[in-house]
């Protein structure tokens, strides 16, 4: 009866875990990051690229999962960044691979704006 059930009709033993951001790192002001631009910041040894896509901000690890090169220097088309080395494409909103030769997504980071300052969440 009460054993092995979560009481909510779902599968036993499955839980939704919310990940909290431990701290926020100031990156750049909104005025300094125009639509279509990117700014790279070191987040505890991880290079993070912050993009302005039509007034919305997104952050991904600045590394192509295909060969480890930086992708922030590639071409940004709307929400898609293309790696300058071999042409892999990633969605900067989700980190999803849109075109090989990469097959693994890039890590994404939470972004917020506080008093005109774009901040990236350090949830490592």
Language-model-detected regions and their locations in the chain:
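N-terminal pre-ligand scaffold of iron-sulfur
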Residues: 2-6, 13-78, 91-92, 96, ...
